[in-house]
A protein has these predicted regions:
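Class I S-adenosyl-L-methionine-dependent methyltransferase catalytic core
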Residues: 1-148
Length: 148
């Protein structure tokens, strides 16, 4: 399925801040998290902290990391960069699962439906469930935007 052009200019380094309400949906699933795709001041890291998470947020080369930042991390939670065709997001998911079995990724609703990704979802022993957001995430500041 082809993606439509949004009409918005692409953000530098693909930085699209995650709204607070999205973070609160994953709150019951983990407490000590690492967000490897944002700096400490990111909205996702701040929202996780406000919800009661202990958060390590980094923005270095995640794919080059051989281990978790410390042994108290029980999950990797991030809005990964997508890259062309979602390839970079797939690399993020694969590497995150190599580091820890508990991973929460903010992805397009249809991201798990591709045949090339069955190893990450259908055939992955760690895949428990998919949380589908009923409200659309607004990634850009807009006056006419709706949502929580």
């Amino acid at each position: 399925m082809a993606q439509r052009q949004s009409g918005y200019q692409r953000q530098p380094d693909d930085v699209y801040e995650t709204p607070t309400w999205v973070t609160q949906i994953i709150a019951p699933y983990c407490r000590h998290v690492w967000d490897p795709a944002n700096g400490p001041a990111s909205r996702l890291a701040q929202s996780l902290r406000q919800t009661g998470f202990e958060v390590v947020a980094t923005n270095d080369d995640f794919l080059a990391r051989a281990s978790l930042p410390h042994d108290r991390i029980d999950a990797i939670c991030t809005n990964p960069p997508y890259g062309n065709g979602g390839r970079l997001a797939c690399q993020f998911i694969t590497h995150a699962l190599e580091l820890t079995p508990t991973v929460a990724m903010l992805l397009r609703v249809d991201f798990d439906s591709g045949k090339a990704r069955t190893n990450l979802f259908r055939d992955c022993e760690h895949f428990v469930h998919k949380i589908v957001l009923l409200d659309r995430i607004v990634w850009f500041e807009r006056e006419d935007a709706s949502g929580p």
